[in-house]
Amino acid sequence: MIGRAALSGLLVAFAVSCGGSGAGSVRTTRSATIAAVIKGLDNPFFATMRDGLVATAGQHNARLRVDAAAGLQDTDGQAVTLESSATQREDCYIVNPINRTNLIHPLSHVREGAPIVNIDSPIDQNAARAVGVKITTYIGTDNVAAGSLAADAMAHLVPRGASVAIITGIPGDATSEARARGFREGARGRFDVVQTIAADFDSERARLAAEDRLRANPPIQGFFAVNDQMALGIAAAVRAAGGSSLVAVTGMDGIPDALAAVKSGAMSATVAQYPYIIGQLGLEACLAAMRGKSVPANVAAPVQVVTKENVERARANFPQPVDPFHDPLARLLKG
């Protein structure tokens, strides 16, 4: 894996030769460059995504520039970064927006015909089309389905009819909302979601929210956090209250600290995403599109539930999935 030292703003350069004459194919008069603008590397999920982008660029001898936002709420800064990248007239853009609309305006300024690959957090397609921005493909987790998987895991951890709380991220964040919606849908007839609390994807805020909820009525028997950083904060609150064996804590993302917490019993489960694979698929989609290949409009990234039963394999395989994953884009890069 690429080291955790910040690569934001650095050009990871490899020789590249990309042919193809289809719509949006890369110019062949010079080395082609792929620009990636992602969320903040203060979250290990996005640092791992960066690693997947960089490693895959190396495997395919691609020329890649990666820029990251200063933090998970740096919407304006991320947009300015992409605006600057757009002036460089890169040949393909990979974007991981902080919200559904903050990158639409700068995307309207990218070179005509340059493919735009949207990874992880979806762009508002209607708003994008309104200003002439065409998204080549979206690659990411089906977050509603992932939330439902988290509910399945919770149903095996708490009694029927148990009281469970959801800890969400930043209000209005599409990913957070989709995960919470999937969890609520999966909870029906199995356990009761009695409260939803926003903690802005922040571990400390989630810890404080969990402390408050643990003191309230009715007694809580489970927490679902829409990301692992918040789940770790909740786990700390549950442990401090002496309820580790009584209150289930499930998260989502499968970051290394969460896998360690599942192994120790501090967390009950996490629905692992694979940001390394999302980065890999994003880079592959750019290469395929630049070669004039037809890339699917939507590519689902893998998700897998990690519990005490399979956490050792999950840790051994990280950042790859627990179980084998079929890469749907690999065939487009052959030959």
Mark where each language-model region is.
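Sec-dependent bacterial lipoprotein signal peptides
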Residues: 1-16
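A residue-level marker of the well-folded mature domains of exported/periplasmic proteins
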Residues: 18-335
